[in-house]
C-alpha cells in the first residue's frame, strides 16, 4: 500500500514538469482528483502529497515550486490526536487542505497537513486540516503547519512560518508569524492568470 502511495506522489511530481498549463490542469483534475475551481492556475513544478485531499477554489493561483500536502487525516478513537496510514483510525476528513477563491499563493510555499510528534516514542504522524479562506495572499517561501486556518483577506508576508490561526483581514509575518497590521476589507478583485505555458 505504501509503495502505491509513493508512486502516486511521484506521478503527481512528474506532472508538475509538463510545460503546458492546460495539460497539467487536466491531469490534476481527472487523474489525481484535485478539486480545482474555474480559472485557477497551478504553475510549473508545483508538488503534491496525496493530491486527492486538496480542494482549490475559483480564480486562485498556486505559484512555482509550491508544495501542497493533502494527506488524508484520520481521527483516533480516543479523539485526542490525529494520524494517518493505520487501520486503528477512522472518520477520514475528505479534503484536509482547502484553499478558497481568489487566493494568491506565491512560489516555494510549503503547506503541511501532517507532521511527526517529536514527543512520541514511535515518532507518530499527527496532523490536522488546513483551511485558507477567500482573498488570502501568501508570500514566497512561507511555511504553513497543520491545523492552521488563515482567515478571509489575510496576508502572510514572505518567509513567515504560520503555526497558529490568522485572523481575517490581517497582515502577519515573521517566525513564528505575528500580527503586523490590518488590511482593507473592501476586496473585490478576481485573479485570472491562466496562460498556455507557465
What is each stretch, according to the model?
Residues 1-33, 39, 102, 135, ...:
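Terminal amphipathic alpha-helical/low-complexity segments used for targeting or macromolecular assembly
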Residues 25, 46-56, 61-149, 175, ...:
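Flexible, glycine/small-residue-enriched loop-and-beta-strand segment within the central core
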Residues 35-36, 48:
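Terminal hydrophobic membrane-targeting helix
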Residues 39-41, 45-46:
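N-terminal start-of-domain structural block
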Residues 41, 137, 155, 161, ...:
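Short-chain dehydrogenase/reductase
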Residues 141-155, 160-164:
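Beta-rich strand-turn-strand
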Residues 168-170, 178:
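Glycine-centered loop/turn positions within well-structured domains
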Amino acid at each position: 500500500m505504501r509503495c502505491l502511495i509513493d508512486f502516486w506522489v511521484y506521478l503527481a511530481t512528474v506532472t508538475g514538469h509538463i510545460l503546458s498549463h492546460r495539460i497539467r490542469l487536466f491531469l490534476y483534475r481527472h487523474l489525481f482528483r484535485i478539486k480545482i475551481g474555474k480559472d485557477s492556475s497551478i504553475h510549473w513544478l508545483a508538488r503534491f502529497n496525496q493530491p486527492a485531499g486538496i480542494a482549490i477554489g475559483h480564480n486562485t493561483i498556486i505559484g512555482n515550486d509550491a508544495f501542497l500536502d493533502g494527506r488524508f487525516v484520520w481521527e483516533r478513537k480516543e479523539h485526542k490526536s490525529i494520524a494517518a496510514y493505520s487501520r486503528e483510525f477512522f472518520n477520514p476528513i475528505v479534503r484536509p487542505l482547502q484553499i478558497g477563491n481568489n487566493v494568491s499563493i506565491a512560489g516555494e510555499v510549503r503547506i503541511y497537513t501532517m507532521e511527526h510528534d517529536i514527543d512520541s516514542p514511535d515518532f507518530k504522524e499527527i496532523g490536522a486540516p488546513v483551511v485558507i479562506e477567500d482573498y488570502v495572499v501568501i508570500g514566497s517561501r512561507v511555511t504553513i503547519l497543520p491545523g492552521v486556518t488563515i482567515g478571509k483577506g489575510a496576508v502572510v508576508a514572505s518567509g513567515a512560518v504560520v503555526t497558529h490561526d490568522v485572523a481575517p483581514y490581517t497582515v502577519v509575518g515573521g517566525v513564528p508569524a505575528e500580527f503586523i497590521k490590518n488590511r482593507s476589507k473592501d476586496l473585490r478583485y478576481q485573479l485570472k492568470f491562466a496562460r498556455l505555458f507557465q
